[in-house]
Amino acid sequence: MATGSHTATLLLAVALLGLPWPQEAGAFPAMPLSSLFANAVLRAQHLHQLAADTYKEFERAYIPEGQRYSIQNAQAAFCFSETIPAPTGKDEAQQRSDMELLRFSLLLIQSWLGPVQLLSRVFTNSLVLGTSDRVYEKLKDLEEGIQALMRELEDGSPRVGQILKQTYDKFDTNLRSDDALLKNYGLLSCFKKDLHKAETYLRVMKCRRFVESSCAF
């Protein structure tokens, strides 16, 4: 029974990931708000998992195990996203409005659109390469989904504006340089953290709007 349920959930996820976003508010047939949220959460989860897998593979390939802890501590304040007043976890996110969380999610996603365009060149001969070379398209797709939700929920509240003025550097393809390796390692760490934030915000919004048994996270 559990296997059948898992299979059905997986098939639903695959189906939702293949659905297009409505291009206009008046598009027909209109997608229910619950489906828009479900679609966005699935895409964010997929991207977060991809970012985590990519980070781990890079770490295994290039960062000596004995150096990982000290490097990770040094990277604690590296991410530009730490400079914006976005919630740092689920509890803080629950104190913000849906529109605030959508705007922060959008800022986080947009800050990576430039840097990830070189990501696939960092992972030659990589098991992750088959998906990492499509990260840009996946980010654009999630950006579009968040914008669709914002159109549906537009409430006239003040916009957060261009808070994240500084985007991330691009990934360095010179993997023979120790500095480049450390830079890429730091970027991948931030990429993983930022996508986790975006996923958390979207899940908080979905759960408080549509009470369901899968809200615990």
From Swiss-Prot:
Record PTM Phosphoserine, positions in chain: S132
Protein localization: Secreted
A Pfam short name: Hormone_1
Cysteine pairings via disulfide bonds: C79-C190, C207-C215
N-terminal signal peptide: 1-27
PROSITE patterns: SOMATOTROPIN_1, SOMATOTROPIN_2
CDD domains (alphabetical): somatotropin_like
GO MF term set: growth factor activity; growth hormone receptor binding; hormone activity; metal ion binding
Record carries keyword Zinc: yes
InterPro entries from the UniProt entry: 4_helix_cytokine-like_core (IPR009079), Somatotropin (IPR034975), Somatotropin/Prolactin (IPR001400), Somatotropin_CS (IPR018116)
Record: residues binding Zn(2+): H46, E199
Primary site of residence: secreted
UniProt entry keywords in alphabetical sequence: Disulfide bond, Hormone, Metal-binding, Phosphoprotein, Secreted, Signal, Zinc
A GO-annotated cellular component: extracellular space
GO BP, sorted A to Z: animal organ development; growth hormone receptor signaling pathway; positive regulation of growth; positive regulation of receptor signaling pathway via JAK-STAT; response to nutrient levels
PANTHER family, A to Z: SOMATOTROPIN, SOMATOTROPIN,PROLACTIN
Function per UniProt: Plays an important role in growth control. Its major role in stimulating body growth is to stimulate the liver and other tissues to secrete IGF1. It stimulates both the differentiation and proliferation of myoblasts. It also stimulates amino acid uptake and protein synthesis in muscle and other tissues.
Sequence similarity: Belongs to the somatotropin/prolactin family.
Protein name: Somatotropin
Organism field: Xanthonycticebus pygmaeus
